[in-house]
């Protein structure tokens, strides 16, 4: 497990991820048409998270899902956070296209 590069972090910021806690965590809000789409997205997160053995903190609201990523073991961001963030962005694009 390696740290996240500044280039990777910039890529995530361009895609709407917000850096929190002095670079120890990233957060993004995904917006949907309704609660069903929000819950469906949550269900889609699970296989990707399991495949990486890396699980996000998630809050589900009526028409949005807020995801926070960090690697608790190291107290900051790693390549696992980057990979899962990219995957979640891909899932979101597929769901909303």
Curated annotation (Swiss-Prot):
It is an enzyme of class 4 (lyase). Disulfide bonds: none annotated. This is Putative pterin-4-alpha-carbinolamine dehydratase. InterPro entries: PCD_sf, Pterin_deHydtase. It catalyses: (4aS,6R)-4a-hydroxy-L-erythro-5,6,7,8-tetrahydrobiopterin = (6R)-L-erythro-6,7-dihydrobiopterin + H2O. One of its GO terms (biological process) is tetrahydrobiopterin biosynthetic process. It holds the Pfam family Pterin_4a. Keywords: Lyase.
